[in-house]
Structures are given as C-alpha cells and as structure tokens.
Amino acid sequence: MRHWKVLAATAAAALLATACSSGGGSSGSTSGPVTLTIWENYGTEQNATALKNLAKAFEAQHKNVTVNVVSQPADNYFALLQAAAVSKTGPDLAVMWTGLFTLQYKEFLTNLKGKIPAADLARIDPDALKWTSDQFNAANGPYVIPLENQFYIGFYNKAAFAKAGVTAVPTDWTQLFAACKKLKAAGYMPLTYGNGGQPLGAEFYPWYDMSYMMIGAHAVTNWQQLYSGQIPWTSAANQAQLAQWAKLKSNGCTNSDVLTKTNNLGDFESGKAAMMVDGTWDTQKFTSALGSKVAAFVPPFSDSPIKGVVDFAGDGLSMTNYTQHSAQALQFLEFMTTSQAAKIINAAGLIPAINGTSTSNPVNQQMLNFVSQDHMTAYPMLDNVVQGNVVNTGSKELPSVLNGSISPKSALSSMQTTLGQLPSTQRGTSYP
C-alpha cells in the first residue's frame, strides 16, 4: 500500500527489543465491559477517518465494548507489531497491508476461514479477499478484512485539457507525449512529480508509475514471473518501458525537479499542473479543490492502448492470534462487511470493497467503471506482489531513471541482483 512500504519493510527487518504496552493481551470478560484495541498506521489520511467512524458505529451497537483506536508511527509500525506479538501485548485488531505483506506476518494473524460466517465473507469483493489469503487463493481463507478498494491512478484537469486542445484522454505513450506538447504550449505543467504528500520523509515513490509500466509490458497472469525471476527485471520489454518513462522529463512533460519538489499536489490542486499519478486516498482532496474539473485516467504507459488498471484492496484489519477478545474482534470484522460499514467508508471518500456497493464520489466511481464498464483488467499493486527487498532497491534506483541520472538498465540490474540474492523459497514459481 502506497508510499510507506520501503521504510516499513526496512524497519520490520529487526524486532524491537521490548514490546509496546497497553495492547490487546490484557484479560477481560466477554460478558462485562471490554476494551477492543485496534492499531493503525494511517496518519491523517481518509482511511483514518473511516476507521474512527467505524469504531464509533460499532460502539453504538455494542454498549459493553469500547474501541480504542491507536495511531502508531508508520515508519516502524510492523516492527512494533512483531515485537508485540512476541510478548503478546499487542492489539486485538491491526491494520495490515495485503499481498505479500499479509503472508509475511501471518504467523501472528488469525486465518478467518470458519471464524467469520461464509455469508459475511461472500459480501466482500472476491478479488479483494484473494490477495489476503495463502497462495493468493480466497478458498484458503483470508487473514484480512479489506477496508477499501484502492487504485493507483492518474488524475487530470479537464479544463486544462480543453484549453490546450487535448480532445481525448491519452491511452498510449505516443498520445501522452502529444498531449504533453499541447499542454506545455498552453502554459501548463503537463505532469507534476515530486515527494509531496508522502507521510514519511521527502522521498519520491516510483511504484505507482512502475505498476503501470509493467501493466504495459506484461499480462497480469505473467506478473508472478517477475516475482520468480522467469521474467528478468532486465528484460528488453522492461528496459523499453523505463526508457519511455525517462523521456517524460527529458521531453519536457514534467517539472525539472521531479525528485525534490514538495508541493506537487499543490501544483495539481491549483490548476498549475494538468496531470499527476497518485491514488484514491487523495481523490477527495482533489474533488474538493477542483470540483467537476478533475477526472481520473489510466496512466497510458504502453506502446498500444493501455488495457489494465491497478484496482487492489491495499489494506484492512486482521485479528491477532493472541487476542483475549476474539469474540468482539470477530464481531468488528463482521461489521466491516455490512452495508452500514460501506456507507461509512464511502462517506470518508473511499471505495468500499463490498459487492454491489458504489461510491458517491464521481471520480472514484469513474475508476470503478474502468473495470465494470470499460472491461479493463484489474491488476494488483506491483509493490505488494514482489519481494520487499526488490521493492526497496527499486525505490532507491528507479527515481534516478526518471531524473535522467542513471540508465534503465542500471536500475533494473540492481533490482535483478537483489532478487538473485534472495533464498529460492522467496522466489518460487508460485506465491507462498
């Protein structure tokens, strides 16, 4: 999930020496007053608002339960969870990222198959559930109840497009470069990049774009071969995609300070920039600033018209396997599958991962329509389905490709070297 991953993966590599206190391991009666503790690492994003409002609604239905939502620092969140699991002093429920993150930490999580009624699980988008299950197969049972469906996505200013004479949203590299030329001539920054909006530090996060470059290069059924190494990171197709990406800056499609610009979100909100690549967690911010001028587009990082979109349940809540309040924790997870919960999540500007629900935000609904009406293939977030060490290396190397500081081959070779250094159990021909 989004831009915290590289720091979190690094911090979680070593357990803290001592565990955090005041967790869910304290004793408590299931019939008397119960305090249910939830840890989250959302910071100030819309997800935090949604979770707090879910907690309030749950408390209203369960008068004996107090839900204590604890905001933990994002930079060492998973190290805190691991340390607390050792001493069993952690939370009852915890925000957990999906994909390989879930499988990495499943030793202290509860598989929810048979714990939550099948009818409740059936209300959840099955594509969301599978990415929280062993072998990414929902039949094996999820470890996470997803909070929302997330998109890595492009946003564009319709008024800027109209003024510049861009009559159609670009769908491939050639059309994108042509649109950039018109937007620049009209006085706009075509695409804004930078490190603004990152919860942790001033770092450019390349995996939104990298996901779309790999969508342009490979079918979703072949993405596992990036994990296994059957498709080398240094493949000609990958190098060609990164070479095109680097042209965005060299051809004047972006700001010159792509790695260090801190107000890139402000450039888009103010109308100075015509496009940016971001995610659903900022949709409400953009619609509040730009109203009907803002719309979503699929980043067209492909030689032929792009046919895939990143549609992925990036996080949700897991129950720890040492909680002493499992009855109440499971009730909360069941509540997350209801239509009432979906309304709360939608009200926070997010997309509920519940079957049959929609979103009141028109830009979020546009993203859903890419799959449901335009029949684009839904892809996961690439940084959730390749190894954390490879993600870390890519986060260090890939930004310099866009900046023109290093070649695509150099960055991809570093990623390939990192992959080759992993034990064979971490790069098999199937997911763990």
Report residues per predicted region.
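Extracytoplasmic/periplasmic substrate-recognition and gating elements
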Residues: 56, 60, 140, 164, ...
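Extracytoplasmic "Venus flytrap"/periplasmic binding protein-like
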Residues: 57-127, 162-171, 267, 275, ...
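Short, low-complexity disordered leader/linker segments with a strong preference
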Residues: 1-37, 60, 118, 424-432
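Extracytoplasmic/periplasmic solute-binding protein
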Residues: 139-147, 152, 177-230
